[in-house]
């Protein structure tokens, strides 16, 4: 029996519920933004039954996965599509970047200094989407100045009703980034090959001149079945002959030497139906055009005919283990193509998969987007340090680029989850590597940089192979344009086995303040990108630092150059923030309380705060929850003494601000998430 769908409800204003406010059951503003509450009062999904055993026909491990189907659509940011979805780190993110003037990243300034904030607009505008320098990658504050006010627009809950329903029934990744801060072609090369080899611009389709190996070729060599499904209308290398047929030049395999059909005879093994490399890659054109050439359901049937046929029992060429889909322009969501057509295309794909339960119940469908189209997204992407091998084109870091949507539909992602490990386009490749190794057919993509492998996860933290939930699902009609009812506590977070931390130490003799950044837990070589921003006294710019469990990093502020004062913040993904401000005591009278704090993160437990007083008078600390649990507490520490306080978390998340009455300049903030599995 199918689960009840998320029910359509009347539109409830511009925003609906947002981000992690489901943890406290209330909507909150980011910066000056305010959004509405939960939209509508229709039925919502029930929680999955606890203690459910492994269903018949499943082993409860990765061997249950038989098919991976990957669809990369075009040019949308995560905030643009999902900034209002409950449980997703969107417009009410209280851990978002703040600027020195007190405004937040949601309050972008135009050339005149006027503030522009996100606004609902269901149009199909496009924005410029060039390389890193375009939005101020070291400050994240030039979106409007480069891309215009429309880059701040986002789609309404009603317009996104279908996609919001898919996310609420399955899993959305809210720390998924495009591979490069650039346009379509480089990002698609990362999906199919693990690199763009420092390319930062689009190029002509089907020139077949990239010499490096693709993942498709590696699958072929490993004996893993694969195929790319697209409409191949056209006579030559034009990419597409209309909006509704062809591949829009998005079949990136046509850019690689291994798929060049030139000079091959009709009997060449590369062209052999069913097994040939070029046949599987759909890298030759046929004369004529697909009919009908319009946006009808009949056209959808036509452009997806090969995929449909592969999913039928007894198919001549059955669905292989790995499939890629490439949509014609009009269905691709690339502005000015609209999102509703893309939602119709995706629903058709899901309907085709569901038509064969043997396939549906053993398939992972991955929907992602190649790039953000210049559309605003507020979350800082991980950033490589200068000189990082394979991650710079001249002086510009290649990636990661802004967040883009990723939805994961499968029996192992069902139930309404948010996965918050850092992923990018190469994560799909490393997932395929992991699966192939499990199948006994290992391969390793040689093109993914070591830095990227350490930063971006392999998607496995988003899936629960031990508790599959097979069976059909119901999805709303995209053309209904109805918002869906998602209760504030519906979305759940996927657990992580690692957490970042940063602590502060003051050397009062030298005048230096040092932040020490660490990473605890995770797989061997796991890394996280920290970015340090001065909040005052120094120019506002980012210092990136890559941290692993074996390579902690430090950031030092010399207060002798700033009159003994310091103020800076450290940001990392999934809501990690540290903010430290104060003035070293030698610049002030000594007859007072002198604050010092030590904060420990206890995996699967909580936060432990030890408050010290290095001065000569009592110090009264105030501990305030800026988000999540904790409320407000006051703790008095006598001179030369210390006191320890336990601080709670919600699903591992915490956000705590420390102040002290003895020193108005002193404040510390600790926000993030502790590991919730060992």
What residues fall within each predicted segment?
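N-terminal pro-sequences and low-complexity stem/linker regions of secreted or lumenal proteins
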Residues: 2-678
């Amino acid at each position: 029996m199918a689960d009840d769908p998320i029910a359509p409800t009347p539109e409830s204003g511009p925003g609906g519920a947002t981000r992690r406010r489901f943890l406290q059951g209330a909507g909150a503003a980011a910066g000056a933004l305010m959004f509405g509450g939960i939209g509508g009062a229709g039925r919502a999904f029930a929680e999955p039954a606890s203690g459910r055993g492994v269903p018949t026909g499943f082993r409860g491990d990765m061997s249950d996965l038989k098919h991976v189907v990957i669809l990369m659509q075009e040019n949308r940011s995560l905030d643009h599509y999902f900034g209002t979805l409950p449980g997703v780190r969107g417009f009410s993110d209280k851990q978002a970047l703040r600027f020195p003037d007190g405004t937040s990243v949601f309050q972008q300034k135009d050339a005149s200094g006027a503030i522009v904030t996100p606004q609902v607009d269901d149009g199909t505008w496009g924005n410029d989407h060039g390389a890193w320098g375009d939005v101020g990658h070291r400050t994240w504050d030039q979106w409007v100045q480069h891309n215009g006010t429309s880059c701040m627009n986002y789609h309404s809950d009603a317009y996104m009703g279908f996609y919001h329903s898919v996310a609420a029934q399955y899993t959305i990744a809210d720390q998924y980034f495009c591979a490069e801060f650039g346009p379509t072609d480089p990002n698609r090369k990362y999906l199919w090959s693990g690199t763009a080899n420092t390319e930062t611009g689009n190029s002509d389709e089907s020139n077949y001149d990239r010499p490096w190996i693709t993942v498709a070729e590696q699958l072929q060599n490993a004996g893993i079945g694969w195929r790319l499904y697209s409409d191949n209308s056209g006579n030559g290398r034009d990419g597409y002959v209309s909006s509704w047929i062809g591949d829009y030049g998005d079949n990136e395999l046509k850019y690689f030497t291994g798929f060049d059909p030139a000079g091959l005879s009709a009997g060449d093994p590369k062209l052999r139906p069913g097994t040939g490399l070029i046949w599987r890659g759909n890298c030759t054109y046929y004369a004529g055009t697909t009919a009908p050439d319009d946006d009808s359901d009949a056209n959808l049937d036509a452009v997806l005919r090969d995929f449909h046929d592969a999913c039928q029992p007894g198919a001549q060429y059955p669905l292989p283990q790995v499939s890629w889909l490439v949509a014609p322009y009009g269905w691709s969501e690339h502005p000015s193509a609209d999102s509703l057509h893309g939602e119709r295309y995706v629903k058709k794909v899901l309907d085709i998969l569901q038509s064969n339960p043997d396939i549906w119940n053993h398939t992972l469908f991955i929907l992602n987007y190649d790039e953000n189209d210049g559309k605003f997204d507020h979350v800082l992407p991980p950033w490589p340090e200068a000189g990082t091998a394979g991650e710079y084109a001249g002086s510009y870091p290649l990636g990661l680029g802004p967040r883009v949507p990723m939805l994961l539909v499968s029996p192992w992602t069902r139930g309404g989850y948010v996965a918050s490990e850092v992923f990018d386009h190469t994560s799909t490749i490393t997932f395929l590597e992991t699966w192939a190794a499990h199948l006994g057919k290992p391969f390793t993509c040689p093109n993914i940089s070591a830095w990227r492998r350490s930063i971006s996860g392999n998607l496995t933290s988003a899936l629960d192979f031990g508790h599959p939930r097979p069976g059909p699902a119901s999805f709303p009609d995209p053309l209904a344009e109805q918002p869906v009812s998602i209760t504030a506590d519906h979305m759940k977070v996927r657990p992580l086995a690692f957490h970042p931390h940063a602590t502060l130490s003051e050397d009062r003799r030298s005048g230096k303040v040092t932040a020490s950044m660490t990473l605890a837990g995770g797989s061997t070589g796991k890394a996280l990108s920290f970015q340090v921003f001065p909040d005052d006294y120094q120019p506002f710019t980012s210092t990136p630092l890559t941290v692993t469990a074996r390579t902690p990093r430090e950031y030092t502020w010399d207060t002798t150059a700033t009159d003994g004062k310091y103020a800076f913040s450290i940001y990392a993904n999934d809501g990690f923030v540290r903010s430290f401000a104060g003035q070293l005591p030698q610049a002030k009278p000594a007859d007072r309380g002198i604050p010092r704090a030590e904060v420990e993160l206890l995996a699967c437990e909580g936060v432990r705060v030890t408050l010290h007083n290095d001065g000569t008078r009592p110090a009264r600390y105030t501990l305030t929850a800026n988000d999540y649990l904790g409320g407000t507490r006051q703790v008095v520490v006598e001179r030369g003494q210390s006191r320890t306080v336990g601080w709670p978390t919600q699903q591992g998340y915490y956000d705590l601000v420390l102040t002290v009455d003895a020193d108005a300049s002193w404040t510390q903030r600790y926000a993030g998430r502790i590991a919730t599995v060992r």
